[in-house]
């Protein structure tokens, strides 16, 4: 008997009817003990094992609310200290919803800035 090549096998499949292909697949499942559901589950488990969680290394400090206007001077001083911005830019920040104070900084630096701003009454989020 001649060796069955992949090309010959595919050519033979092309000549089969749909019913014959289904019978072939069922025969292969029975002969080799293949459970289609088990293949699907194990394939997804392999994908899950390959996925690695990347730890975030850069953070942004976002001020949701600067607090009362009675704290305006401490807020301006603190934001100036953190950003180095001038008065005009700080005023624009104070009037901006979800103002980004710092971007692409370490988690430790973001926590430090958050604590400074929360001490003066601001609502801060780290992303």
Curated annotation (Swiss-Prot):
Keywords, alphabetical: Ribonucleoprotein, Ribosomal protein
A single GO molecular function term of this UniProt record: mRNA binding
Record carries keyword Lipid biosynthesis: no
Gene Ontology annotations for the cellular component aspect, listed alphabetically: cytosolic large ribosomal subunit
InterPro entries reported in the protein's UniProt record: Ribosomal_bL12, Ribosomal_bL12_C, Ribosomal_bL12_C/ClpS-like, Ribosomal_bL12_oligo, Ribosomal_bL12_oligo_N_sf
Superkingdom of the source species: Bacteria
One GO biological process term: translation
Subunit structure of this chain's protein: Homodimer. Part of the ribosomal stalk of the 50S ribosomal subunit. Forms a multimeric L10(L12)X complex, where L10 forms an elongated spine to which 2 to 4 L12 dimers bind in a sequential fashion. Binds GTP-bound translation factors.
UniProt name for this protein: Large ribosomal subunit protein bL12
Organism: Phytoplasma mali (strain AT)
Gene that produces this protein: rplL
């Amino acid at each position: 008997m001649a060796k069955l090549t992949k090309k010959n096998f595919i050519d033979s499949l092309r000549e089969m009817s749909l019913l014959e292909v289904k019978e072939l697949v069922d025969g292969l499942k029975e002969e080799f003990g293949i459970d289609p559901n088990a293949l699907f589950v194990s394939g997804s488990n392999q994908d899950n094992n390959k996925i690695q969680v990347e730890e975030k290394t850069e953070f942004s400090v976002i001020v949701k609310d600067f607090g009362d206007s009675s704290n305006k001077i401490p807020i301006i001083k603190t934001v100036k200290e953190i950003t180095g911005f001038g008065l005009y830019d700080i005023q624009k920040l104070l009037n901006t919803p979800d103002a980004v104070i710092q971007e692409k900084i370490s988690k430790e630096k973001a926590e430090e800035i958050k604590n400074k701003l929360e001490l003066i009454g601001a609502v801060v989020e780290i992303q």
